[in-house]
Amino acid sequence: GDWSSDVCSSDLGNAYPEVKQYLEMERKVLFTGTACQIAGLKNYLRKEYDNLYTVDVLCHGVPSPKIWRMYLEEQKKQYGASVEKAEFRNKVYGWNNYSVTIDFSGMQQYCVQFSEDQFMRMFISNLDLRPSCYACQFKALPRSSDMTIGDSWGIERVMPDLGDDKGISVILVHSQKGGRILQEVQEKLITREANLDEVLPPTADSRKSVAMHPNRKKYLRGLQNGESFDVLYGYVRKSFLQKAAGFIRYM
């Protein structure tokens, strides 16, 4: 299937060896991923390459691949069809209230605002993230990548004229190489300089480790004991909407 989002865990497969192979062939390589994936690549390569360009995406955390598979199975059961494509940032309801859409074989589609989707509720409430995400060593700035990109949530507070609900990206440059990349594409973009702490507050989940959900241990125990997706989802419980509002404002 096609999973169009930073909400799912990506499968790196043989990406690191392939990157090294292309670099040794003196080909230019652009590697994008989470900050921890880029740190892993740098650790694997053990040396700097002038022809390697790295861009990390702002990251809230990465959910369990197992719960993602369980979620897909639930969707397949409900619709009686296989999943062809999933999007977690669809703008059919606007950027701030983005929707989750799933295309099934047979032309069926599931489409709800993110705050109504069970998988997204578990993700945003920090219930189903990887253990390392609760003590992330890679969210500090500056990062080992050349650039960081992501959604500029809350931009309307800083630059009201940009609050059109169509989506604004934030770009952070960490190296001379990153600066050159931005300069080369600048004429194709509408850009504006901004204060870092205003567009990406230090309290944002993309700059600090997220807090563990109070029911996390119960959830893990249930996952290990083979509890159903619906039972596991029940551990989200209270204060979700409050958490979701904070997620939109400060991710």
Residue ranges and their predicted role:
Residues 81-251:
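Long, compositionally biased charged/polar accessory segments in the mid-to-C-terminal portions
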Residues 27-33, 52:
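Generic beta-sheet signal
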Residues 8-11, 56-63, 196:
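Short, acidic/turn-prone active-site loops that include or flank metal/cofactor-
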Residues 11-22:
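A short, well-structured juxtamembrane/interface segment
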Residues 7, 36, 133-136:
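Short cysteine clusters
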Residues 1-3, 7-9:
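Short, small-residue-biased leader/transition segments that mark boundaries at the very start
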Residues 31-41, 61-63, 93:
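Gly/Ser/Thr-rich loops at beta-strand to alpha-helix junctions
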Residues 50-74, 202:
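Short, flexible loop segments at boundaries between secondary-structure elements
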